[in-house]
Structures are given as structure tokens and as C-alpha cells.
Amino acid sequence: VGRFPPGWAEWNDKFRDTVRSYWKGDAGLLPDLAKRISGSGDLFNKRGRKPWASINFVTAHDGFNLNDLVSYNDKHNEANGEDNRDGHSNNHSWNHGVEGPTDDPEILELRERQKRNLLATVLLSHGTPMLLAGDEFGHTQNGNNNAYAQDNDINWPNWLGISARGRALREFTRRLIATRKAFPILYRSRFLIGSRNEELDVTDVSWLTPAATDMTIEQWQDGNARCFGMLLDGRAQESGIERRGS
């Protein structure tokens, strides 16, 4: 990842794996997560490339879709006729207590919250967001993470049969997209590197603890730390805010 020349955008699988693992609850990911949501400058900030070169995603046509990412620990590809040997086994997924469908309201609510967490991370991070069709309303592939051979309901999003939960998730997704479009600071043409505008006394990005103090090296390295704040200030590099292609 990051080896293509300027003008190309690339699927950022490091973004996918880091974001999946972070929301699953894995420890020690704060430094890498900060890099991913700020445009993955460690991968793309070279040879004149821009933040949009990073295509940010957590799901694609290969692997679990969003609903199954929060509903299954393991792949269930028996319908493919290969004795579940096909498909990737390291999915960075979490079923939240029950494998597959459940009627438990607490688990269902937690899964919906996690879907929103993942969608918000994709759509509000620096880079080019990519969504998988059907994720916006919770389409399921029944745990199949290699559904290339399924010309049926496993692969067909049911646009006419969306549940109440699905409609709520779709509206949440719509509002996220509207938010991204409304605030150019979310799609700068320059990488966020903590550069400071001395005249205005502002920094393009500040990383904060839950107590709103600046993160220290020790806090970044704390394996038990699970959250931080990201403060963007559009005044730091006003001339660097532009749409792709401008």
C-alpha cells in the first residue's frame, strides 16, 4: 500500500484492519488509528500525493459485510460447496456475544452502535471513503465472507424490505455523508501533520486525552488507553482546503 505514483488512489487495507480491530476492542492501537483517520500520511505523504489517495473502507465485495462484521466471529461459507475452506479466516470481527442472528435486545443494540461507529470512522476520516452497497441498511450475507458464487439473496440487497433498524441506520449514514460534504475541513488537500500557524496560534490537528489535555508520548504508548480526541482547526492552513481535482 502506498507505492503507486501520484494520481492514483489505493484501497487502504491498513485502514480497514486497524479500524476493525480498534472497534473490536483490541489494545495498543491508538497511534496507528491516529495515522489512519488523519489520511495515512505514513503511507501516502510522498511524491506530491494527496490525502484522497487513501481509499478508506472497512468492508468491500470480498470478506464480511458490515452487518456480519459485528455479528460473526467466524466465516460460514458452507453454501459455497467448499466445506468452509474458502475465504479469509482473520476477519478482525466480533459477534458481541452470539454467533449470527439473535433476539437479545442488548446485543442487537450494541451491534447497531458498532455499525454506526464503523460508518462514522470511514466517512469522517481524511481520505476517500468507500462504502459497500447494502451496509447502509444492514444487509447480511449470513456469515459468508466469500460470496462470489451466490447469485441469490445472500448477495442481493433487499432494497424493498428494509427493517426499522435498517431505516434508522440508512438515515444515520445519510446524515454522515451530509456532514462530510458540509465541512471542507474533513477533506483537506494537505496531510494533517500537526503543523502550526504561528500568526494565528493554531495547529491543523491536535490530539487530546479524554481530559482535553495534549497527548504525551507516554499516553500514546499506553496499551491500556482506548480513546483520544482529534481537534481540527481550519484556520491553520486555509489555502490547503480544496476538493479533489481543484
Give the location of each predicted region.
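Conserved alpha/beta catalytic core and glycan-binding cleft of carbohydrate-active enzymes
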Residues: 1-133, 137, 146-150, 184-187, ...
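A short catalytic or substrate-binding loop motif that flags glycine-/basic-rich loops and adjacent residues
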Residues: 49-51, 220-226, 243
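Acyl/amide activation-and-transfer machinery of modular secondary-metabolite enzymes
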Residues: 148-159
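Aromatic- and carboxylate-lined catalytic core of secreted/periplasmic carbohydrate-active enzymes
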Residues: 163-190
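Charged, flexible boundary elements
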Residues: 213-237
